[in-house]
């Protein structure tokens, strides 16, 4: 995931979809820690001092401990378990281009118009409690998440990256891409 993020970091905003609340913080912290270890953290921080101040103040304001840990480094998290105030704070910071990378559950795929140039879907299986097993995401869910990339009113092109098991590759390659502004050059 880190290498895919680094291909776009500093150039475009990135929205990463994970499939659990816990995974949002885990992924954001992994990206932050990896960037720190590889001395690339500056790529994720806003270029202006004013924007860095906005993130520092937002981190102090946030209720969610994981969000506080990540915000000041240019990473955000978003899921339904956060307070409404924290979710709105993250949405505003991402819309204002203060946050470079936002890791979210599908809460941002439905009902919130928050586009990004690059969308990464980290994993394609979700746990279905009714079936008591892991199931592949539906084509509708996949397209809804990928539809956050390169929205016409915000960008001229978008990139969707799907990280999945090799045996599921053909399934995702066969999905109809109904968004003419979206390209899917990378599927892992």
Residue positions per predicted region:
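Short glycine-/polar-rich loops that comprise or flank the Walker A/P-loop
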Residues: 11-12, 72-73, 115-118, 155-160
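Conserved segment of the helicase C-terminal RecA-like domain
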Residues: 138-173
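Conserved C-terminal RecA-like helicase domain
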Residues: 22-101, 134-140
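Conserved interdomain linker/interface between the two RecA-like ATPase lobes of SF2 helicase motors
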Residues: 1-25
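Conserved small/polar residues in nucleotide/adenosyl-binding loops
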Residues: 180-186
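Conserved nucleotide-binding/hydrolysis micro-motifs of P-loop NTPases
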Residues: 21-24, 82-83, 108-110, 125-127, ...
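Conserved RecA-like helicase motor core of SF1/SF2 enzymes
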Residues: 96-100, 106-148
């Amino acid at each position: 995931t880190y290498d895919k993020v680094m291909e776009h970091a500093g150039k475009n905003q990135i929205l990463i979809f994970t499939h659990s609340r816990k995974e949002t913080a885990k992924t954001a912290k992994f990206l932050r820690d990896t960037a720190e270890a590889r001395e690339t953290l500056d790529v994720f921080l806003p270029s202006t001092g004013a924007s860095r101040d906005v993130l520092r103040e937002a981190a102090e304001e946030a209720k969610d401990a994981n969000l506080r840990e990540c915000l000041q480094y240019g990473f955000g998290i978003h899921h339904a378990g956060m307070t409404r105030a924290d979710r709105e704070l993250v949405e505003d910071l991402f819309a204002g281009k203060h946050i470079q990378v936002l890791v979210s559950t599908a809460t941002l795929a439905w009902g919130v118009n928050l586009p990004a140039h690059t969308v990464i879907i980290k994993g394609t299986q979700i746990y279905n409690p009714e079936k008591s097993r892991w199931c592949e995401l539906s084509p509708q869910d996949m397209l809804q998440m990928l539809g956050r990339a390169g929205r016409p009113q915000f960008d001229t092109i978008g990139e969707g990256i799907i990280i999945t098991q090799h045996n599921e590759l053909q399934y995702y390659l066969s999905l109809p891409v109904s968004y003419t502004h979206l390209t899917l050059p990378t599927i892992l």
